[in-house]
Amino acid sequence: MSLIHINVFLAFTTSLMGLLMYRSHLMSSLLCLEGMMLSLFIMATMMVLNSHFTLASMMPIILLVFAACEAALGLSLLVMISNTYGTDYVQNLNLLQC
């Protein structure tokens, strides 16, 4: 593996660990998800460029579209939660609370 692959894999792992460890605020969770999607986009782009498979050239763009949709939905949920509860805690999303 080259140094670039190792760095992208470490970026994905760091984002995943951040998502698992810092779950109190919704904004930090969204930032970690965006880091994971960016790492996946870079990995998919490198895979397509290295394989020279023309049919798979749309995969990174489709992944980028899904990342943009995920970011838009996450930010709209963040605005709705912060307007309703006044904070962006993830515990406010639990529907089983009394």
Swiss-Prot record:
The record's GO CC annotations read: mitochondrial inner membrane; respiratory chain complex I
Look up the EC number in the record and give it.
7.1.1.2
**GO: which molecular function terms?**
NADH dehydrogenase (ubiquinone) activity
PANTHER family annotated for this entry?
NADH-UBIQUINONE OXIDOREDUCTASE CHAIN 4L (PTHR11434:SF0), NADH-UBIQUINONE OXIDOREDUCTASE SUBUNIT ND4L (PTHR11434)
State the similarity comment.
Answer: Belongs to the complex I subunit 4L family.
Fill in the subunit field for this protein: Core subunit of respiratory chain NADH dehydrogenase (Complex I) which is composed of 45 different subunits.
Tell me the protein's name.
Answer: NADH-ubiquinone oxidoreductase chain 4L
* Originating species: Ceratotherium simum
Classification from the root reads: Eukaryota, Metazoa, Chordata, Craniata, Vertebrata
